[in-house]
Amino acid sequence: MKVLKFGAVWCNGCVVMKPRWGQLEKEFPWLQTEFYDYDRDKDMVRKYNVTDELPMVVFLDKQGNEFLRISGEISKEKIVEIILANKDK
């Protein structure tokens, strides 16, 4: 599983989510995550059809297929639930 995180410096929810993801990346070192800036990484923003509803998180399976997309702030507990339920994807 890979997690693509989209955010921007002007996004308040992105600022809130950054430390949550930092904690999760330490707790789940095997989890592959990548961050893309909404204003700078336009190719990835277009590729994944990311709107300005940030933060946006796109979950990909091992084949690179999207299986879940969430926008807005997410509790750490909910993210853990998603990770554990899909860790073998």
Regions found by a protein language model. Name each.
Residues M17, F28-L31, F59:
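Non-catalytic interaction surface on structured domains
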Residues Y48-F59:
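Structural micro-motif
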